[in-house]
Amino acid sequence: MLAMALIESAIERGGLVARGAFALDEADRRAGLSGVEAIVLVGAAGARGWSAFAASPEARDGRPHPLDRWSRRVIGALATALGARALYPFEGPPYPPFQRWAMRAEPVHVSPLGLLIHPEYGLWHSYRGALAFAEPIAVPVIARRASPCEACSARPCLSACPVGAFGEDGYDVAACAAHLRKAAGRACMDGGCLARRACPVGASQAHRPAQASFHMRAFLSARGAPG
């Protein structure tokens, strides 16, 4: 049985963060993961994971999708070294259910913005891939916690967006993107989503300007607009 500490160490050497693990059941295997015993999620948390990408060739070569290409290279190499299969949230359709996997692997919950909220990192974390193992691993027991959003009556995240893109009906992607394309959207483009930044949980983990701006430009680029 593979030790989780060995897997975590390998992921950290690759510049990323181990984001929890879970053992699969028969329903998972029937859903297309036959032969897989356990999954370890790989991603970023706060600033952890950013510096390795920012120093990579992919970040500077000017080609599309640099973060996805870097994730594929790094996580693919980890999979080869650890005898696992690499899975990615951006490969599909069908796309692997990374949000559901995350809620099995870590004490995260769906926030009012639709993003998963972590008790330490707040909304400042992501999942870049997963390692699927054909043999069992020693999956850590998760200390389950209530969502921090349950005790937040003010919910500043829902009122901070300049164009009200977040509400009871969900996320108005078109309104958000249209705002970012205008001069009035520079605060979001340069410093990151204002609704996300309004959340007090994990505020110290918020992306610094270079990281925030990269992700906002990538968001616009995915919607056919230059960042």
Predicted features and spans:
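Non-ligating segments of multi-cofactor redox enzymes
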Residues: M1-G227
